């Protein structure tokens, strides 16, 4: 039965008789080998349908259908552990482990998580979302089961993009040191989100081009049939390459492959052989991102993720903040040849495609290597250049030591464009940018800005670039508020806030709202409603800078303020509001103050607006919080 190639995403649920009978992998394991091809085809059809209903990660899931079927067929899950790296390719896994009918709720409020989550299923052995953690976690499980004298098979499924991170090799090195019983499946599709880059990607390509196969015949096992690409090769009774030519063997792993990751029959043979071996083993499988859906095979970057196919397109939307960043980057680079741009494998997501094409010699995609990205920038700055690092807030966490030790400690001139700051909606807690104020504002020499709109974002990026030292601009996911973006760039006064509204009332009482970043315009809306409803004056301030704060403005406003309110799309603990609290305490400014922001909990996925409502950070929620606080200030019961 050949692989089916689909050209459209179905709007009606496909007929999937074999798949419908699988609510547990044990039922899959009761099928004949010959039925697995049909299971894989039904699974691929169902993923096409489900992704169209819910949106979400797409190409990676289509690419691991046969691999997932083979893994659950050969290994005794959940007792045997499957550890998925990153997890955006886990939809087939979720469908085969009792969540078939729920898969259309993925990424929705109260629905399935976008990634494997331990609280969701016993089959989700490790919670993921960030890259390159699977081998470390899997090694920990293997060593724990060895210690408990209850061994099991632990299989880590890792993409070639994830293997570019140092953590993966740290874990492999340690696995060899412990002679751990661990299987690493290298899912090689030459992609992370963008195309894989660097020496490791070239190494994998070299292995592939040699066309050698592993003949797992050392103990009389059946010969593994070759991938069609290699039918001209005779049988080989040796490993893919000599140890000197194979990085994995040089580290100390037994290496098998590369195999066709879409040949489910061969994969079953391979995994059944490997179960009989011990020690650290690596299976190299070659897959195609978007397999089985023609548009995704042709354009895997665009089809990394998709939206709901029936979602209303609406009218024209403002530019995304990532696009504002990308336009600024090109404009700034045209004026200053010292500008170099760095991204850790997020060229498209960070809005850098245009820059990469326009200035290819000044663009550095370092793969999934956030620590390296930050220190690479530090080294460039040491030579008098002005590097700009484009990075998601949640991923900068991985380079925190480098931010402190390699950049800030030396007061190096590095600009950080921090994307996806705040809540990120359907991607859930693993991708939320909830902590960057807290982890950056404690670092000496750092300047931190947050724009109220897309035009101010452009001006802040220019300001950060002009500043001679480490500076960060953090901006949210998605579109701006719709203001006109000025082509001319101006440098903002460092640490200077902006009063956006002074709403006067008949009473002498005043509330001051200190708003940061994405919450400024929403706080203004709430303030206007409060002033009109309660006849109380309200001053709304766009703070602009988290560090340095506009301390003088706070002092001046405190003389007339009866209640301070801080508002931010960031964790309350350690955030911008905490910085205001600390300053007021040091200055002995004794005024009532409330801090509005994200609670001390990990927030599960929903739409961005739903999450803001749940946190009380929409206009209605901010208004309600101000009203409650004002009642307390006036001791009204």
Swiss-Prot record:
Q: How is the cofactor bound?
A: Binds 1 Mg(2+) ion per subunit. Binds 1 thiamine pyrophosphate per subunit.
- The EC number of this protein is 2.2.1.7
Question: Which key words are in the record?
Answer: Isoprene biosynthesis, Magnesium, Metal-binding, Thiamine biosynthesis, Thiamine pyrophosphate, Transferase
According to its UniProt record, which reaction does this protein catalyse? D-glyceraldehyde 3-phosphate + pyruvate + H(+) = 1-deoxy-D-xylulose 5-phosphate + CO2
List GO terms (cellular component aspect).
cytosol
PANTHER family membership? 1-D-DEOXYXYLULOSE 5-PHOSPHATE SYNTHASE-RELATED, 1-DEOXY-D-XYLULOSE-5-PHOSPHATE SYNTHASE, CHLOROPLASTIC
MF GO annotations: 1-deoxy-D-xylulose-5-phosphate synthase activity; magnesium ion binding; thiamine pyrophosphate binding
Q: Tell me the domain of life.
A: Bacteria
Q: What is this protein called?
A: 1-deoxy-D-xylulose-5-phosphate synthase
Name any cofactors this protein relies on: Mg(2+); thiamine diphosphate
Q: Which residues bind Mg(2+)?
A: 160, 189
Binding-site positions, thiamine diphosphate: 88, 129-131, 161-162, 189, 293, 370
Annotated InterPro entries: Dxylulose-5-P_synthase, THDP-binding, Transketo_C/PFOR_II, Transketolase-like_Pyr-bd, Transketolase_BS, Transketolase_C
The function of this protein is: Catalyzes the acyloin condensation reaction between C atoms 2 and 3 of pyruvate and glyceraldehyde 3-phosphate to yield 1-deoxy-D-xylulose-5-phosphate (DXP).
- The organism encoding this protein is Acinetobacter baumannii (strain SDF)
One BP annotation, GO: 1-deoxy-D-xylulose 5-phosphate biosynthetic process
Enzyme class name: transferase
- SUPFAM superfamilies with a match to the protein in the record: Thiamin diphosphate-binding fold (THDP-binding) (SSF52518), TK C-terminal domain-like (SSF52922)
Q: In which pathway does it act?
A: Metabolic intermediate biosynthesis; 1-deoxy-D-xylulose 5-phosphate biosynthesis; 1-deoxy-D-xylulose 5-phosphate from D-glyceraldehyde 3-phosphate and pyruvate: step 1/1
Which Pfam families does the entry link to? DXP_synthase_N, Transket_pyr, Transketolase_C
How does the annotation summarize its subunit structure? Homodimer.
